[in-house]
Amino acid sequence: MTQVAHANSRLQEVLDKGVLRVGTTGDWNPMTMKDPATNSYRGFDIDVTTELAKDLGVKVEYVATDWKTLVNDITANKYDITGSASLNMSRAKVAGYSQPYFYLAFVPVVQKKDLAKFSDWADFDKPDVKVAATLGTVQEKMVKDFFPSAQHIVIEAPARDFQELLARRADVSVTSNVEAATLVEKFKQLAIVPVKEPRKPTPIAMLLPQDDQVWINYINHWVELKKTQGFFKQTAEKWGLKSM
């Protein structure tokens, strides 16, 4: 039984084909960023999955996806594994996860000139506040739960929620502390609201086919080994990332 399971596993398929297919969105700085001119990717996730492919002894192939189809594409066998994704139980109903290797939390981002109006989470739960979110992201459900009284602007990738904020069509977007730090550095008109504490501390892991325990076990062993050897810590530091 074990030999049959191994033979039918995605692990054996990857080894036989010599290619690891990785689903990535290319729009989460600094985790995964796509250069449209070259169609190449860079970021924390790219370093992680390149290392995984190297340890498997195979090539890596990046498959473009977006947040609303990230889980469906793993179940449809469009790729073998994803880059980093927030762990949530809705996704876990239909896809498997590796063990986590990074932790983040969520903060609100506003126009810097609006900091006088917004100082904590409760300030956004008002009928005259417009909250932006990207379809299919963890934040889409999160902001509806956080701010039921607010107006919700849900936009579809490749557009992003923070672009609504930049265009003044929204008052706030909620994103990870990771992305928020890169946004306020890139766009000087934006600021992170100094809330009392970030919300929803969340593990980050890779998505895998739910019914392939052999493949999940292999990836979990790899993650544990690399965590122990300091690989994830060093890679996070390279990209200016700080785990919660």
Language-model features: locations:
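Periplasmic-binding protein-like
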Residues: 103-107, 181-224, 242-244
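A ligand-binding cleft/hinge motif common to bilobed small-molecule-binding domains
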Residues: 69, 85-94, 142-145, 166-167, ...
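Alpha-to-beta junction loops
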Residues: 20-21, 57-59, 75-84, 129-130, ...
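Flexible hinge/capping segments at coil-to-helix
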Residues: 112-130
